[in-house]
Amino acid sequence: MKIGVLALQGAFREHLNMLGTLGAEAVEVRKAEGLPELSGLIIPGGESTTITKLLDIFGMAEPIKALAKKGMPIWGTCAGMICLAKELPGDISGVKPLGLMDITVRRNAFGRQVNSFEAMLKVKGLDEADFPAVFIRAPLVEKTGKGVEILSKLPDGTIVAVRENNLLAISFHPELSGDNRFHRYFVQMAKTYKA
């Protein structure tokens, strides 16, 4: 089983390191040719405009969409959540999301870099201990479709983690937390996928 981390831009090394703590075979993905051999793909945080443009330039958007429809697990963190969304309200100039998840996501919902914060969250599917979530220019989920399961919310009710079948999206950066439980959760999703 091989898990790919999209390595076009953003926090991909940190995801690779976190997967390494679990003994998972993790590879950097920069070309569409490497996608079919994967059991799962992580789209990391970074700059959503840049990531979506590079997905198009490198011819990866359509193959990723096709694999998602076949059931391959795909996990978007922060900017990766934006990439997976069907709808992005407001000014989204330059951002072309993959449109895979039935969610409406607002970019930079918590403000600028200086407004970054950490929060301890209860997360459905993880054990009872709270998860240390790191929010950096994070998006939030404004609306979910019928088939979308809400995994976590901030204390004020803001949705920050969702799952829709084989697709997982979270607002924050678990790769920066020092806690590998979210990565373990995704590895379990990937184990169920038959390429």
UniProtKB/Swiss-Prot annotation:
* Protein's UniProt keywords contain Secreted: no
Supply one GO BP term.
Answer: pyridoxal phosphate biosynthetic process
* Active-site residue list: 78, 173, 175
Q: List the CDD domains.
A: GATase1_PB (cd01749)
Q: What is its EC number?
A: 4.3.3.6, 3.5.1.2
Tell me the disulfide pairings in this chain: none
Any one Gene Ontology MF annotation carried by this entry is: glutaminase activity
The protein's UniProt keywords, in alphabetical order, are: Glutamine amidotransferase, Hydrolase, Lyase, Pyridoxal phosphate
Q: Show the catalytic activity.
A: aldehydo-D-ribose 5-phosphate + D-glyceraldehyde 3-phosphate + L-glutamine = pyridoxal 5'-phosphate + L-glutamate + phosphate + 3 H2O + H(+); L-glutamine + H2O = L-glutamate + NH4(+)
Give the binding site residues for L-glutamine.
46-48, 107, 136-137
The record's section on InterPro entries has: Class_I_gatase-like, PdxT/SNO, PdxT/SNO_CS
> Which Pfam families does the UniProt entry name for this protein?
SNO
Q: What Gene Ontology cellular component terms go with this record?
A: cytosol; glutaminase complex
Where does this protein act, in terms of pathway?
Cofactor biosynthesis; pyridoxal 5'-phosphate biosynthesis
* Function of the molecule: Catalyzes the hydrolysis of glutamine to glutamate and ammonia as part of the biosynthesis of pyridoxal 5'-phosphate. The resulting ammonia molecule is channeled to the active site of PdxS.
Can you tell me which family this protein belongs to?
Belongs to the glutaminase PdxT/SNO family.
NCBIfam families in alphabetical order: PLP_synth_Pdx2
Q: How does it assemble?
A: In the presence of PdxS, forms a dodecamer of heterodimers. Only shows activity in the heterodimer.
According to UniProt, the name of this protein is Pyridoxal 5'-phosphate synthase subunit PdxT
List the gene name: pdxT
